């Protein structure tokens, strides 16, 4: 598997009033393997493994200095396992097939992407920290599948609750001064996702999430996507 990513960010310091813009672009390539049973009711155990090599170009543009550029690269790998329980199956009066499932999950991810050390516009050495972090996750997902057997279209809404633990803090060493993001070593997440099979080869999906940890840390996001099968 492979992919391309592009991200733009903007941060502002409430203490000194300065802003900074950032851009990241790059690629990933790797492989994955999945085990699951082929029961038509989609229940039972599963296991998922993937390994990726990632390479990015990072740019930072502070409001009070010139643009800085550096690279980040490394390997990331994940092992996930879980079990899906069938809660209820039925066919409605209109002929729509309904299936409700509960899936318990556990995952371990090693984050090996490391940012290159670089010199900023003021001639200070900057080095990111946190590479080699091992993130563990335990979670539960409940979903309901609506399938129209006549058209083949399907809709699947999900609700997921996760708990994450990191072994390292993510931060920066700036001219020998260390700082890191607080509140992210342990945090919870609630996520809502909906998938729709609009045709034989096209799937659309959207998701929204909210994360919260200690020290008033929080993060919210929304995503949309499409999958085309050839």
Language-model regions: role of each:
Residues 1-230:
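Membrane translocator/pore-forming domains, dominated by Gram-negative outer-membrane beta-barrels
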């Amino acid at each position: 598997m492979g992919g391309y990513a592009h991200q733009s960010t903007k941060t502002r310091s409430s203490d000194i009033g300065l802003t900074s813009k950032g851009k990241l672009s790059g690629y990933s390539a790797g492989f994955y393997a999945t085990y699951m049973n082929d029961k038509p009711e989609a229940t039972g155990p599963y296991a998922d493994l993937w390994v990726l090599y990632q390479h990015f170009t990072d740019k930072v543009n502070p409001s009070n200095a010139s643009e800085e550029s550096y690279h980040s690269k490394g390997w990331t790998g994940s092992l996930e396992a879980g079990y899906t329980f069938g809660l209820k199956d039925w066919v409605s009066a209109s002929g729509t097939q309904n299936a409700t499932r509960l899936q318990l999950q556990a995952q371990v991810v090693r984050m090996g992407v490391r940012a290159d050390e670089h010199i900023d516009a003021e001639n200070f050495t900057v080095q990111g920290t946190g590479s080699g972090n091992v993130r563990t996750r335990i979670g539960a997902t409940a979903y309901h599948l609506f399938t129209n057997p006549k058209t083949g279209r399907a809709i699947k809404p999900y609700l997921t609750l996760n708990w994450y633990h990191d072994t390292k803090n993510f931060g920066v060493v700036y001219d020998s001064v260390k700082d890191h993001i607080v509140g992210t070593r342990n945090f919870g997440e609630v996520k809502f996702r909906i998938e729709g099979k609009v045709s034989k080869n096209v799937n659309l999906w959207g998701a929204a999430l909210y994360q919260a940890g200690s020290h008033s840390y929080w993060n919210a996001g929304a995503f949309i996507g499409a999958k085309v099968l050839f």
